Curated annotation (Swiss-Prot):
Keywords associated with the record: Glycosidase, Hydrolase, Metal-binding, Zinc
Disruption phenotype: No chromogen 5-bromo-4-chloro-3-indolyl-beta-D-galactopyranoside (X-Gal) hydrolysis. Reduces beta-galactosidase activity observed with polygalacturonic acid, citrus and apple pectins, galactan and soy flour.
Function, as annotated: Involved in galactan degradation. Hydrolyzes galactooligosaccharides released by the endo-beta-1,4-galactanase GanB from galactan. Degrades galactotetraose, galactotriose and galactobiose, generating galactose as the end product. It is unable to use lactose.
Keyword Zinc annotated: yes
pH behavior: Optimum pH is 6.0-6.5.
Temperature sensitivity of activity: Optimum temperature is 50 degrees Celsius. Thermolabile above 50 degrees Celsius.
Name of this chain's protein: Beta-galactosidase GanA
InterPro entries xrefs: Beta_galactosidase_C, Beta_galactosidase_Trimer, Class_I_gatase-like, Glyco_hydro_42, Glyco_hydro_42_N, Glyco_hydro_b, Glycoside_hydrolase_SF
Length: 672
């Protein structure tokens, strides 16, 4: 298990005493892996063509001397001032067509040949010098790729991308973007510009294609970065760190990670949940952490890496509250339980100046191993040292929820429904909740992944759906799968053009219904549905449904669609399809999905009886179940093991009742 984090010795080159202390503190903190060089370009190449690698040579040797490993970063995330000054084409241009000044980070032009050449060259030098060093574990490409550039170079690249996508046919493009609307038809490629608040931003097809282009151009930039690394170090794995947006930990929207995942050897991501906030319970937030972990793990169906987190507070939330005692261990073990093979922090040593000098770190400004945060990091390290056999183990699931970046983009761009209540990823989290509460493993997959391994596939709010996806959902259900779809699904195709002539005929065949209209409610509006003799509250969206051949499971109670279907079920060949026409309260989700859990014989990997707020997650290999029992409440909780298990940390055999303290985690193993 990797334990450590972002280490920036380049900030302390004038303090050899600090660098010496770092090595001592690494051993005391039970850390073993360090991401080095992420923003070090100015230290590596202070002037164009003048290189200073000696300090990095020394760091490699120091870390190697204690048995540590280095995740070596390429430095493109922040460039030296001389590079911006000498080659202004590398500066990003924003959507309002304003060229940015030098400064900040993550703000280069994605297309600039100069910047691509410069990054490829410095990367080659790093690979030549450190590619065969025994401490080198992995390449960390740039840092948190994101954002877009609207300069002339990028406009040209975008037009070339469009020519390729639309077979050099403006007629095809004009149809796909529905440009006759507002007389926006293009008759020359040079007329096309990227979306802009001072230009075109109302063509949804253009907006969607721009986002696709930015993803492809970012991947192209990344692929340029790794050319020398693949050539010189073909056996060293490569990653780049993905992100999620707080406070709800929704997948980062700047890039389609489902595409990017195909180009990395391992998924890694930076997790910064707002623990101990004042608007939700610890368990509610833990559920959201579980969801995003299961999405990023499922991208490659293999363990991922937690590349960044904080051992205590961050510096960029609205309120930067410290992790309470025990929370760093609990939150770290949750990451491991959901598939991570690492706990890596930002930052190892707290910066003395600039914007992140107050961001949490393993080593604080006091330079002491005696403070609470350092001691809790050391405890995480001691725990991880006992979990080496968990590395590489999987989390097999029979249930999947489908998340789609392009659908998210299109739905957010749609000028309809209600902007504040679309909440696509939060809706997926609501459907995920019942399975998390029942400790049932879930894969959060994308539309291109294989549906066949699953008994149950849940597809909420799939507003954008292609013919290919419809066909694959049809095959999944016909072959015996159980499919759940909701309101605001099947509205547009991959060009963000609406389907005409009613709901897609294959969707009508699968579900035995046709949605006729969607009623969008004001945030304070409420309705209700009756389901199995119980009344459940409904808000935000209600679909008026025409039943063809389906069975009615629930009906609306009020408004002009009172006594009409709200939830339906339909036998389709060997499978079954449910359509949920309204946004319903959490208790409906629990009751509905508990019925499917029973019908489909879905179960936890290893059953542990517990109360609300305790999560039990497991990883498996052929011989063992590694079970993480986690108390995400502020109270003591009773859990019960009906079978004997071995506590990995103590070696004790546990059975029957066990009282857990608040924020406590117990890790046990069940041998098959």
């Amino acid at each position: 298990m990797l334990h450590g984090g972002d280490y920036n010795p380049d900030q302390w080159l004038d303090r050899p005493d600090i660098l010496a202390d770092d090595i001592k503190l690494m051993k005391l903190s039970h850390t073993n892996t360090f991401s080095v060089g992420i923003f070090a370009w100015s230290a590596l190449e202070p002037e164009e063509g003048v290189y200073q690698f000696e300090w990095l040579d020394d760091i490699f040797e120091r870390i190697h001397s204690i048995g540590g490993r280095v995740i070596l970063a390429t430095p493109s995330g922040a460039r030296p001032a001389w590079l911006s000054q000498t080659y202004p084409e590398v500066l990003r241009v924003n959507a309002s067509r304003v060229k940015q000044l030098h400064g900040g980070r993550h703000n280069h032009c994605l297309t600039s040949k100069v910047y691509r050449e410069k990054t490829r060259h410095i990367n080659r030098l790093l690979a030549e010098r450190y590619g065969h060093h025994p401490a080198l574990l992995m390449w960390h490409i740039s840092n948190e790729y994101g954002g877009d550039c609207h300069c002339d170079l990028c406009q040209h690249a975008f037009r070339e991308w469009l020519k390729s996508k639309y077979d050099n046919s403006l007629k095809t493009l004009n149809h796909a973007w529905w440009t006759p609307f507002w007389s926006h038809t293009f008759n020359d490629w040079s007329q096309i510009e990227s979306p802009s608040p001072i230009g075109e931003n109302g063509l949804h097809g253009l907006n969607l294609d721009w986002r696709r282009f930015v993803t492809d151009q970012t991947i192209s930039f990344y692929e340029n970065e790794i050319i020398p690394l693949k050539e010189l170090t073909p056996d060293i794995p490569i990653t780049t760190n993905f992100m999620a947006d707080t406070p709800d930990l929704i997948p980062y929207q700047g890039l389609d990670y489902s595409k990017f995942a195909k180009h990395v050897d391992a998924i890694s991501w930076d997790a910064y949940p707002v623990w101990h906030n004042d608007w939700e319970s610890t368990a509610d937030l833990a559920m959201k952490v579980g969801f995003i972990n299961d999405l990023y793990r499922s991208l490659k169906q293999q363990p991922f890496l937690l590349m960044e987190c904080t051992p205590s507070a961050v510096n960029w939330h609205n309120v930067n509250k410290a992790k309470r005692p025990g929370m760093n261990l609990l939150s770290s073990m949750q990451m491991i339980a959901h598939g991570s093979d690492s706990v890596l922090y930002f930052q190892y040593r707290k910066s003395r100046g600039s914007s992140e000098k107050l961001h949490g770190a393993v080593v604080d400004h006091d330079n002491s191993p005696k403070n609470r945060v350092f001691q809790e990091v050391a405890k995480v390290g001691e725990t991880l040292e006992r979990l080496s056999e968990v590395v590489g183990t999987k989390r097999p699931a029979q249930t999947a929820i489908l998340y789609d970046w392009e659908n998210h983009w299109a739905l957010e761009d749609a000028q309809g429904f209600a902007k504040a209540t679309k909440r696509y990823p939060q809706t997926l989290q609501q459907h995920y909740r019942t399975f998390w509460e029942h400790d049932i493993p879930v894969d959060v997959i994308t539309k291109e992944q294989d549906f066949s391994p699953y008994k149950l596939l849940i597809v909420p709010m799939l507003y954008l759906i292609s013919e290919d996806t419809v066909s694959r959902l049809k095959a999944f259900t016909a072959d015996g799968g159980t499919l759940v779809m909701t309101y605001i699904s099947g509205v547009v195709n991959e060009h963000d053009l609406t389907y005409t002539g009613g709901w897609h005929p294959d969707l009508q065949a699968i579900f035995g219904v046709e949605p006729l209209e969607t009623d969008t409610l004001y945030p304070k509006d409420r309705n209700a549905v009756s389901y199995r003799s119980q009344i459940y509250e409904m808000k935000d969206y209600a679909t008026v449904i025409d039943v063809k051949t389906a069975s009615v499971e629930a009906v609306y109670q009020e408004d002009f669609y009172a006594r009409t279907p709200a939830v339906t079920s339909h036998e389709y060949q060997q499978g079954k399809a449910y359509f949920i026409g309204a946004r319903l309260e959490d208790q409906f989700q629990r009751d509905f999905y508990e019925g499917l859990i029973t019908d489909l014989s879905l179960s936890p990997v290893f059953p542990v009886r517990h109360g609300k707020g305790v999560s039990v997650q497991a990883r498996q290999d052929q011989d063992n179940d590694y079970i993480f029992v986690m108390n995400f409440t502020e109270e003591k909780q009773l859990v019960t093991f009906d079978q004997s298990v071995k506590d990995i940390m103590t070696g004790d055999i546990l059975s029957g009742d066990l009282t857990m303290e608040k924020y406590e985690v117990r890790i046990v193993v069940n041998t098959h």
